[in-house]
Amino acid sequence: MAKHNGIKKRTRYKLQKTLRTRGMPNVTKVIQNFDEGQKVHLVLDSSVQKGQPHPRFHGKTGTIVGKRGRAWLLEIKDGNATKTVIARPQHLTAQKYN
């Protein structure tokens, strides 16, 4: 069989939702706002494919740098490198305590 190298390979359990959280997200999750410099957690919502960053960033914490259209720009540390990730608000959760 041929080798498959899709962007969502090996994410069978990583992007799986629990029974209670299935379905589309709330409207408040879609229209949430953030301030520049605010810390956010990147938790991918598998029911929304639009604006979803690469699964390697799932569970990471980053800092809001700016806004691009409906999406937010985040700076995330990946080892020693600082990477800029573009994600929609459905995939972001504000950190409770800075």
Swiss-Prot record:
The lineage of its organism: Archaea, Methanobacteriati, Methanobacteriota, Stenosarchaea group, Methanomicrobia. The keyword Calcium does not apply. This is Large ribosomal subunit protein eL21. It comes from Methanocorpusculum labreanum (strain ATCC 43576 / DSM 4855 / Z). Transmembrane segments: none annotated. GO terms for cellular component: ribonucleoprotein complex; ribosome. Keywords: Ribonucleoprotein, Ribosomal protein. One of its GO terms (molecular function) is structural constituent of ribosome. GO terms for biological process: translation. The keyword Transmembrane does not apply.
